[in-house]
Amino acid sequence: MAKLRHIAMVVEEMEKTAQFYEKSFGLQRVRQTDTAIGLSDGVVSLVIIHPSNVNMKGDDRRGLHHLGFLVDDVDRESAKVEANGAVRQGGIINSERGTETERKFRDPNGQMFDLTSPEYARDFWRIAV
């Protein structure tokens, strides 16, 4: 069975983006070059690539839609990402039980991501938490 190893995004402001994900989610910087920064949570890596990277040339590439983060406390983590420059997007997804389960945001580069509760991950996505 294959396992997800990394997610890559192309941005103009690599350092600003890396600092946002380090401060907001505790990702660790594991690699850096002039045109890429690698962050990791110890399982999956987030690679932040500058458009000048020779491996990223070409106008036909498709971008990333959004990232999803599993968090213990949606309210607490929402406050943290907003303090680091994220902007909340759209409405809130609620479970049938009425508890808040997911919020969507945009990071300082405009990249969308969501914060998901363990209950939503387990009940909707069937992810063991």
Each model region followed by its residue ranges:
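Short secondary-structure junctions
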Residues: 26-32, 87-92
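N-terminal beta-strand motif that seeds the catalytic metal site of vicinal oxygen chelate
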Residues: 1-15, 45, 65-69, 119-129
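Amphipathic alpha-helical segments
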Residues: 13-28, 81
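Vicinal oxygen chelate
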Residues: 4-12, 40, 57-129, ...
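Conserved short beta-strand elements that form part of the metal-binding/catalytic scaffold
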Residues: 28-61, 105, 112-119
